Every structure is written in structure tokens, then in C-alpha cells.
Amino acid sequence: MSKKYKHTKELNDKQSPSTGSCTAFYGKSGWEGFKKPYMFFEVADCSSKVRLHNSRLDKRDVFIKKMKRLRNELDRFIVFLDDV
């Protein structure tokens, strides 16, 4: 596997005392026997974290569909909040 991607973005302003970040990853898994590329998108805040990742059964296109659904729902929620 030659391609690798890892990027973390802080979500709060620099002067904020709160923590929050999102991380996107594509690369080799550290799990034994996991031969396919490992992909995840993780969102974290002060006390919690959630990771959407591919399973051994997911193909790359299935994972991409999940990510697009997540993005679309987040966009809808932002539009709603802007109008409240």
C-alpha cells in the first residue's frame, strides 16, 4: 500500500480552553490479518469521541457512501441551526 492519508483539524478557536478535533485516516491497519486499507473519520470533544470506520466487510465505495451521508446530514443540520 503506497497511499496514506492522515489529517487532524482542531475544531475550536485557538483561544478556547475546550478541546475538539476531527481526524481522517487512510492507511495500513495495525490489526493482524487486516490486509485491506483501514479508513476512519473521528470526531472528538472534551469528553467523548466517535469513530466511523470501515469494517472487514466494507469495500471502499461503501465507506465513501457512509461518509457522504454523514456530510449531507451535517450540512442539513447546519442549515437548520442557521435558520433557528
What label would you give each PLM region?
Residues 1-84:
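Positively charged, low-complexity terminal tracts
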